[in-house]
Swiss-Prot record:
N-terminal signal peptide: none
Gene Ontology MF terms in the entry: tryptophan synthase activity
Pathway where it operates: Amino-acid biosynthesis; L-tryptophan biosynthesis; L-tryptophan from chorismate: step 5/5
Matches recorded under CDD domains: Tryptophan_synthase_alpha (cd04724)
Function noted in UniProt: The alpha subunit is responsible for the aldol cleavage of indoleglycerol phosphate to indole and glyceraldehyde 3-phosphate.
Subunit structure: Tetramer of two alpha and two beta chains.
Catalytic activity: (1S,2R)-1-C-(indol-3-yl)glycerol 3-phosphate + L-serine = D-glyceraldehyde 3-phosphate + L-tryptophan + H2O
InterPro entries: Aldolase_TIM (IPR013785), RibuloseP-bd_barrel (IPR011060), Trp_synthase_alpha_AS (IPR018204), Trp_synthase_suA (IPR002028)
Gene: trpA
Record protein name field: Tryptophan synthase alpha chain
EC number in record: 4.2.1.20
Amino acid sequence: MERYQQLFDRLASNKEGAFVPFVTLGDPNPALSLQIIDTLVEAGADALELGIPFSDPLADGPTIQSAALRAFASGVTPTQCFEMLAAIRQKHPSMPIGLLMYANLVFHKGIDAFYQRCAEVGVDSVLIADVPYEESAPFRAAAIRHGIAPIFICPPNADDDLLREISSHGRGYTYLLSRAGVTGTESRAQLPLHHLVNKLREYHAAPPLQGFGISEPAQVRDALQAGAAGAISGSAIVKIIEQNHTQPAEMLTRLATFVSEMKAATRA
């Protein structure tokens, strides 16, 4: 959890926001997936948000669903994903690493065992996309027990009670939804979110990172101007993988360009 605090402190002192890319572990195959993650870090990613492939990803649009299918086609398993996470942590010791996933994968070997394994491989945070705050108690208790930050989604229509609960129980960062619906770049991020950001700050929430529909530098700047601490981009990155995975060198070059341009927008 401390890695997020250290990151946000460093960015604040540099007057920068955070740029956080999302990719699915094992997409398009384990070896290339690790190269992709190294490329994201080298191009300027401030933290990583990583998915474990899941067969029924309710919160995801077609782009990220396709990423899971590519990973499955290459034989990726949850066990292998944790081995990859350990390798990523070893290579990038100070980088905050978050998982964005679904409850079935947490239940598979038991909630406590899941968070224990996260701690062993150096994961900093876990966001479970299909567990609403009201059902989160056993997950967040296990997370805290093992030193993992429980991440909560703040939807655009959050009422005051939910904002207080998220602020009280969330750690690491707060996932601020640009809009309702599933992930994807087809629906652009909708702003402003000033009122939510102001309330989260008033209730001492973990710093908000805006996600869903973030695909261009102007949207990163808009998120920061609305008071967010940074932005998360998933579908736009996964689309680059989808369109270029048969040409790895071209894919890595395009990913590096995209991330460096998005990161540059956090300094504007």
